Amino acid sequence: MSGVLPVRARAQGVSPSLAGIDLLQVLGDGVVGAPESAPTLRDPGRIARWETGEWRYRITSGARSGQTEVESLALISATARGETWKRTIGQESTLFLREVSGGGLVLPSQVTHPHQALVYFEPPLSYLIAGLGPGESRTFDGRMDVYSVNNPGIKWYTGRIRATTVYTGVYRITTPAGAFRAALIKTEYQIDIFAVVSVKDTLYTFYAEGIGKVAEAEHRRIAAMGLFNSDTKVGKVLVSYTPINLPTRVESP
């Protein structure tokens, strides 16, 4: 079955404590602070600052600890799949997204640069979900088709993906760019390919209204039967954000 399944939200109130969540330790001491009251996410694009701009992050753990990673967001001409936004995440990946009714965003395709892979999601993968109440979740089930980015006519494989997104609550987050009241979105991905390769990816992403993503902790586990296994944890915190003002369009008379 493909699509998105809802889970009921809890009433608005103080967000649950994040104490005991080991993954958040990769962000460093003093980053994640006290829980605060959490409203419904009526406009996730506003919380995530879905506008052209550039965000610079400091990597706080893993092999690249101390390095800077740049993320950018840009408008593009509509593609054949209706994508009108491009989000570039360092040298790791480029996401192509489109807006949907109600204020959310979906991810029809992405490029994973280290593997030179072009990935199509069917149906498009939920990316930002409008209307989530605190504690509410959505589960997405779908298919992913993976092609060579250098030769899109060559299909490498097909897999299944399940994504569970939870709006956990709102928390005080302190980064080199400042202190923020930030909404926490937890996303868990389960990817299975040929019943041979299994990928489990967990992300805790903090968004501050008017700024966008201010911190993120990720735990990725890859198991390939009889081939290899990997287990990596990466944290990043915001250092700076620069909006990019697009030139005003002048219509011909």
Predicted segments, located by residue:
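N-terminal export leaders
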Residues: 1-2
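Acidic, serine/threonine-rich low-complexity disordered tracts
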Residues: 5-96, 148-253
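Contiguous hydrophobic, core-forming segments of folded domains
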Residues: 80-148
